[in-house]
């Protein structure tokens, strides 16, 4: 058999290559291997940090673009989500505020949804979603500074009908009164 005949047996035009399918397999394998080798806590920490780096980077980009360091919670949410339209389709369904926190109820269709949907060993709201948690919590921490003590994103449930995860974002207020800056005359 010559090389041409041999190559015909498995020839595949490059337009038929499915990179997302390969990514889904590698991503699922990575999550399972890290969990099996190092444990669940290490996996969650690693995935959070994978998201935190880009979260810090997008916050820095936003601050530079707006030439500001200070944003309100709802302003930061709107700016960040607008900047991330290529990766997320998020809709805010409810906003609640009390003395201690601001709570947003959201529908989130993210870039991880399709890979998770095709993997039997992955579920919505599972470990891989820590990438998003790290991303958003780090970005908001940078954009909101001292106004917020902590930001926490919680997966509530997967809504198959809406093809989105239902989540809440809690912004815990820093109720410590910040001293006004004084100027030396």
Language-model-derived ranges and their functions:
Residues 125-145:
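Active-site helix/loop of acyl-thioester processing domains in fatty-acid/polyketide metabolism
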């Amino acid at each position: 058999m010559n090389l041409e005949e041999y190559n015909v047996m498995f020839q595949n035009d490059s337009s038929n290559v499915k990179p997302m399918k390969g990514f889904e397999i590698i991503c699922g394998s990575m999550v399972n291997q890290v969990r099996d080798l190092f444990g669940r806590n290490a996996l969650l920490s690693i995935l959070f940090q994978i998201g935190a780096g880009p979260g810090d980077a997008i916050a820095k980009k936003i601050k530079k673009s707006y030439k500001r360091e200070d944003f309100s919670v709802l302003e930061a949410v709107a700016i960040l989500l607008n900047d991330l339209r290529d990766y997320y389709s998020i809709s805010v369904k409810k906003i609640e505020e009390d003395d201690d926190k601001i709570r947003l109820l959201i529908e989130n269709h993210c870039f991880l949804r399709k890979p998770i949907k095709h993997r039997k060993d992955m579920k919505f709201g599972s470990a891989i979603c820590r990438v998003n948690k790290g991303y958003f919590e780090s970005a908001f921490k940078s954009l909101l500074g001292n106004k917020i003590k902590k930001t926490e994103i919680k997966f509530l449930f997967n809504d198959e009908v809406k093809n989105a995860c239902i989540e809440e974002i809690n912004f815990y207020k820093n109720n410590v009164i910040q001293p006004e800056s004084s100027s030396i005359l």
